[in-house]
């Protein structure tokens, strides 16, 4: 299988990431040393799997050991013996007074990225419960975060590193829906799934509030395919799980998984 064979399964804007993973694998082969990736979202991990399996590369994922959405991957020579410390993975716990404050995923991520001055891939999952939140981070950032962050929004917070064994379990249910859509265009799918007007759908997309497979998309005419994950700020996330074909009226019958946070 060549890279061209892999390209056909992904969007053109993902080709650069395909090349990045291919170059990392080549580096490991040339140097006989291992390399650890930054945090990868599920779409990026799917691409990584495709590239590494094509090359016959050996790899380990933190997702084999921790139930998380974002994972880190070790690409290694065949003789490499896994050391969990090589994932460079740390768990930070955030304590705050839930009686007077309410922390959200967005508030936490915005504050941490501001303090770190880095891109999103340095942070993994952010889990929020009443009075407590957790965030997975690259280990090199642990001390800086713990000693620098004292406020998130208006809330006073206390950060501390805790063992990975204390990782919270994500609380999320899946609601399965079957819907009929006139088109696989992004704007029309949002109208169908979210039960909003075409005007509202267009405004959300053009305001950069819609992501497809974790990447912001501002084209209302973006064509969706089976397996795409769509997230809409303020509305949640859903996956086009299966395209069940056309109805007698030549409309698309789709099976959708809608994520519901408890």
Regions found by a protein language model. Give the residues of each.
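Ferredoxin-like alpha/beta domains used as RNA- or RNAP-binding modules
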Residues: 1-187, 193, 216, 237-262
């Amino acid at each position: 299988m060549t890279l061209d064979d892999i390209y056909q399964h992904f969007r053109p804007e993902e080709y650069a990431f395909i090349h990045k993973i291919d170059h990392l694998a080549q580096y490991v082969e040339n140097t006989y040393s291992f390399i650890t990736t930054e945090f990868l979202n599920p779409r990026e991990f799917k691409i990584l799997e495709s590239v590494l399996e094509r090359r016959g590369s050996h790899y380990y994922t933190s997702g084999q050991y921790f139930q998380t959405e974002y994972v880190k991957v070790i690409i290694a020579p065949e003789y490499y013996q896994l050391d969990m410390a090589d994932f460079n993975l740390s768990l930070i716990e955030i304590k705050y007074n839930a009686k007077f404050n309410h922390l959200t995923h967005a508030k936490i991520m915005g504050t941490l990225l501001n303090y770190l001055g880095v891109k999103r891939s340095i942070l993994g999952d952010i889990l929020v419960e009443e009075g407590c939140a957790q965030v997975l981070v690259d280990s090199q950032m642990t001390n800086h975060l713990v000693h620098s962050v004292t406020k998130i929004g208006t809330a006073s917070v206390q950060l501390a590193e805790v063992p990975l064994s204390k990782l919270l379990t994500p609380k999320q249910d899946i609601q399965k829906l079957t819907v009929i859509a006139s088109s696989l265009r992004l704007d029309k799918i949002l109208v169908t799934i979210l039960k909003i007007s075409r005007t509202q759908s267009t405004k959300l997309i053009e305001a950069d509030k819609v992501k497809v497979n974790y990447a912001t998309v501002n084209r209302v005419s973006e064509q969706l395919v089976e397996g795409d994950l769509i997230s809409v700020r303020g509305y949640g996330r859903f996956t086009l799980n299966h395209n069940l074909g056309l109805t007698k009226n030549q409309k698309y019958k789709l099976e959708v998984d809608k994520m519901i946070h408890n």
